[in-house]
Amino acid sequence: MELIFNIEPQQQERPRATGRGRFIRVYDPPKTAKFKRELKQLAMLEMRGKTKYEKAISVTIRFYRKVQKSISKKEHTRRTEGHVRPIVKPDLDNYIKSTLDALNGVIWTDDATIVELNTSKWYADDPRIEIEVKELKNDEERNQN
C-alpha cells in the first residue's frame, strides 16, 4: 500500500510536563500535537474501508521538507532534483517518532508489527510524507510458495 500525505513533516519535540500537587502530567507541545492529530485524520480517511495491518510489515517513509527561500535558483534546483539532501535539523529520528505515533492504530494495529523500517529526508517545493507499507510473509509461508 502506498500513501501520500500532503502535510509538512513535523519533528517530535521534547514532551512538556506540568505538576499539580503530587500529580504530574506529560504532554506533547502544541505543534507536535497538532501535527499528530492532522496526520491521523488524513490516515483515517485513506484507511476508510481497509483493514489495518496485523502481521509483520515493512515500512518505507520519505519525508519531503520545504526548500529554504534564501537560496539561489541554481541551488534550489539542485535540492528539488535530489542532488543535495537535507543534512540539517530536525533529525530524521524525530520525524520518524512523530509520524509513527500518529499512524499507530490507524494503518497498523500496533507499531510492534513494524519489523523493517527504511526512511529518508528530501527537499521539495510541496512538503509531504510518502509511506509504503508491505506485509511480510513469515518463513513458513515463504517455503510453501
Predicted segments with their positions:
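Acidic, proline/glycine-enriched N-terminal capping motif
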Residues: 1-145
